[in-house]
Amino acid sequence: MSAPRCAVRWLVALLGGPALLLVAPAARACGVSASGVASCSLAEHAEEVRPHWATGVSALYTSTELRFDGSVDADQTRYAALAALAYLPTATLVLQAGVGVALGGSLTLPDGKHEFLPGPTGSLGVDWRAWDDGRFFLLLSAVLSASFARTQLPGAEAVGYQALDLRIGGQFGVDVADVLRPYAVARAFGGPIFWQYQGADVSGTDAHHYQLGAGLGVRLSRLLNAFVEGIPLGEQALSLGVGLAF
């Protein structure tokens, strides 16, 4: 995705994944939404006192395999820094927007390593706390992302790289002592990549259209939360961040 394909998801990535669900009627469920920011709910359930806004920052590393026209495969790694702002119209619904910068990474192909130059990403997403009994919780998310970057092979001119991504995910977790929230996460995603390889325009997509992993949310204070998440299966990723409700 996520600023190429991996970065598109970071805002999920983002938006395919990790969040800003800093509300809950009675419990304090926590996870990571598609935007990637810690999602811990609050004890305050009255409409007049619960937070209606949240913001977060996160960092993320991803590693995956891409497949382009002509059965050309590429190994991709990316690093990114992300920021997100969310509006919480109800105690279970979060509407969010994110922006970020992919700071580095590469595409490794038969002709060598194509380095990514910094580029922007953007995303729009929605999170829904579908179930929460005060101990266990289920969070669902959907995010649409776009990313723009350039790649450069040593000795050659830089070329454009654009990606679109739609990611749908779910997290199931448990509240431990009202402080720790371990969870399992599954996401499915897809979308096109537009690039130029060896002088020709090509399109591609991820060889893996899923993520399976786990994470941990930590309640640092009434309004401040942090998270770390690892994805070993599918599109591999490691992310961490903090979220603040207000």
Regions of interest found by a model, annotated:
Residues 2-18:
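Bacterial N-terminal signal peptides that target proteins for export
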Residues 30-31:
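Boundary of Sec targeting at the N-terminus
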Residues 80-82, 121-125, 167-169, 213-215, ...:
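Membrane-embedded beta-strand positions in outer-membrane beta-barrel channels/transporters
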Residues 85-88, 113-120, 127-135:
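Short, charge-rich binding segments
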Residues 79, 83-107:
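Long, hydrophobic/aromatic-enriched structural stretches that serve as scaffold segments
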Residues 97-125:
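Surface-exposed loop and membrane-interface regions of Gram-negative outer-membrane beta-barrel proteins
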Residues 34-41, 46-48, 52-77, 88, ...:
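Outer-membrane beta-barrel transmembrane domain signature
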